[in-house]
Curated annotation (Swiss-Prot):
Record-listed Zn(2+) 1 binding positions: C143, C146, C202, C205
Record-listed N6-acetyllysine modification sites: K39, K152
Lipidated sites in chain (S-farnesyl cysteine): C409
Region (Disordered): 365-412
GO annotation, biological process: protein refolding; response to heat
Cross-link (Glycyl lysine isopeptide (Lys-Gly) (interchain with G-Cter in SUMO2)): K134
SMART domains in UniProt: DnaJ
Residues carrying Cysteine methyl ester: C409
Residues that bear Phosphoserine: S78, S123, S394, S395
Name assigned to this protein: DnaJ homolog subfamily A member 2
Residues that bear Phosphotyrosine: Y391
Amino acid sequence: MANVADTKLYDILGVPPGASENELKKAYRKLAKEYHPDKNPNAGDKFKEISFAYEVLSNPEKRELYDRYGEQGLREGSGGGGGMDDIFSHIFGGGLFGFMGNQSRSRNGRRRGEDMMHPLKVSLEDLYNGKTTKLQLSKNVLCSACSGQGGKSGAVQKCSACRGRGVRIMIRQLAPGMVQQMQSVCSDCNGEGEVINEKDRCKKCEGKKVIKEVKILEVHVDKGMKHGQRITFTGEADQAPGVEPGDIVLLLQEKEHEVFQRDGNDLHMTYKIGLVEALCGFQFTFKHLDARQIVVKYPPGKVIEPGCVRVVRGEGMPQYRNPFEKGDLYIKFDVQFPENNWINPDKLSELEDLLPSRPEVPNVIGETEEVELQEFDSTRGSGGGQRREAYNDSSDEESSSHHGPGVQCAHQ
């Protein structure tokens, strides 16, 4: 005899735990024929047991779970649904879903309601300085007039059509010895499992058991919080009878800032300076996220290259829950060059004397051809006239393989 944790399902089919697949199928067909509702209307529950037992034992994975861990293995390994809760309750005692430990159940075993997610837009200043704000929400709460019963005491009756389950189980025969079990929401009680006569319904909630209520939440946005971070209000979501309320979850959405961009705890900004500032030093002031006026100085004689980045330590974002520690501020410099012909030609020689010497031009032996540099507008394409057309006569394959994006000046 095979060593298994539980034999109840084998006993239902009347086979030993070591039964083969053919033995299981043979036993199932014999019992299904004997207890089919069309032939034996009073044996509906027995037929469900037989179908369930065969469904588990004919599936190698489910059978292995059942053989090794018994009923508990099926409870923890099953996803539920399809009327499984009723069958488990009938065969083993206690529903399937009470053992699942998933999000639909709270720690105390009560069914748990859904969480309510709301976006909360915040500025970068809010995330830097912290902020307290009030948020108005509408949610369902239990009716105080009927204490969430929907009517006066004793008026609520179990739905006779679905026996209080909220769903109806239907069995459809697919072929001789093969059936399909289906469930649908009970139309008599709209899936609630209960019915209330219209004359006995609560006047305040009209039998719905809940009413709408406006809730004001005080929201604390702490310093250093980030885009996508969540603020949770436990148990503040919609209420329902016999259900533990879910949570209200606020999802922070950072609005774009006109000066700063955030990267973790660091801040980035771009600042434009002129050529004279890049060569001779500069000083500028900007307003930080906490309204402080920050003065940035750069000494004469130290050159700022176009596109280079300098850092100011400790002027980034505060760390979440450790606001006295801050990230850094990175400033990228956009050096603005003067317009064409900005200086009198007579002064150019004086300027050249002040700048570093030109590199020596090597002597070229042989014939040379002088060309002219022209302005290039990248938005209008490369042009090129006939020379470009001739160049494009090469095959598409060669073109796609070797013609990458044009080389651009590198800025560091």
